[in-house]
Amino acid sequence: MVPVVALVGRPNVGKSTLFNRLTRTRDALVADFPGLTRDRKYGRAEVEGREFICIDTGGIDGTEDGVETRMAEQSLLAIEEADVVLFMVDARAGLMPADEAIAKHLRSREKPTFLVANKTDGLDPDQAVVDFYSLGLGEIYPIAASHGRGVLSLLEHVLLPWMDDVAPQEEVDEDAEYWAQFEVEQNGEEAPEDDFDPQSLPIKLAIVGRPNVGKSTLTNRILGEERVVVYDMPGTTRDSIYIPMERDEREYVLIDTAGVRKRGKITDAVEKFSVIKTLQAIEDANVVLLVIDAREGISDQDLSLLGFILNSGRSLVIVVNKWDGLSQEVKEQVKETLDFRLGFIDFARVHFISALHGSDVGNLFESVREAYDSSTRRVSTAMLTRIMTMAVEDHQPPLVRGRRVKLKYAHAGGYNPPIVVIHGNQVKDLPDSYKRYLMNYFRKSLEVMGTPIRIQFKEGENPYANKRNTLTPTQMRKRKRLMKHIKKSK
């Protein structure tokens, strides 16, 4: 098993900064703002080729109230999940009562714990950490996470020896293929098409929507545990949380995201970062669950978010939440509104659920798998060309400047979303109505559901363009005789 390392401590001691440093990412939101991290965030890290899982947690200070109570519960759960704990304290702020309370809890759990004093840059490390020895956790390791000072020493002299004791190096991670593919995607590289098997990779499933529509409640319902903070307050989730899971022998990576509001209502800098993370999560996902509040109906912001999903080419499943408790008359009105405002999304499945009570949640995954399979299915050039030919036979392309547009052949240009490339003459002059006709024809013929189809057109090149006709010697002699004859006749 890959060791699990949890970062715990008071708010704003630098846990997310160290998390980003260890995982070599910027996945965790970082700001000089206590209480920014609210959910457990997992990341992959390594030291000298040895991998471990790092968990970033929300701060604990003993004065939690409201949503902060749920944050503290998440941090305590992370301690239970971890094999080793890095207990972080703030060297600049000094020893606090909350530090003593956390240390007491850690001692009661009897977990391997290492005390890390952060923010020692510009200070005498020995002098800055002396008060923390009273916590009774042994050696103290001074670092400056924001600049990386002391982090490598922490890994080499603390984590690596501990890992050598508890995890033999010969152990192979059974998820290595997934993480290798993840690294390839992150670096912008692409594996050869012959080696690609979409069924061998986890389906990345993003749950998005406006604030407080029930995204985290749905996430917890799917997982069957209180994995993310749920509170009846808009903006509870601030970061995108990636959660591996398995259902019906199929692997998924569930992505719970922050709510997206109208741009004019986003005033907090942290919320702006959260929105960016949500949009990045959409682009990173294979399938997106767009959650809509049945009691509030479809807003312009829902349509804006829907537009971003479609422009990103992601597969889509629409989820209407909070369906329980509505009268039959209201339900009919909601369905009519959906048909009217979302009529152009005829390829997406719509589910009416209650995330709180779990009604119809289990049926979501059938639509998710259908959408993913449609977006990654391989189709041969012969099949696509045959479909294109049938479409032309059923409805001829229009005349352009007196000439009929000619479509020659079609082939696949990409997947997730499926891209069909059509070659022909004057194809760029085709009207939008005929392009939509072709797109719908391909969708029906291929039985594509849950994912948009994109069609690209390429003009056939004229082989004689920009070439001069060079006469042969015989043609030159004939031309001279012809010119002489013309001159004599004049």
Swiss-Prot record:
Gene Ontology biological-process entries: ribosome biogenesis
Signal sequence interval, chain numbering: none
Xref: InterPro entries: G_ENGA, GTP-bd, GTPase_Der, KH_dom-like, KH_dom-like_a/b, P-loop_NTPase, Small_GTP-bd
GO molecular function terms listed in the Swiss-Prot or TrEMBL record: GTP binding; ribosome binding
Highest taxon listed in the record's lineage: Bacteria
Record keywords, A-Z: GTP-binding, Nucleotide-binding, Repeat, Ribosome biogenesis
EngA-type G domain: residues covered: 3-166, 203-376
Subunit structure comment from the entry: Associates with the 50S ribosomal subunit.
UniProt xrefs under HAMAP family: GTPase_Der
Record protein name field: GTPase Der
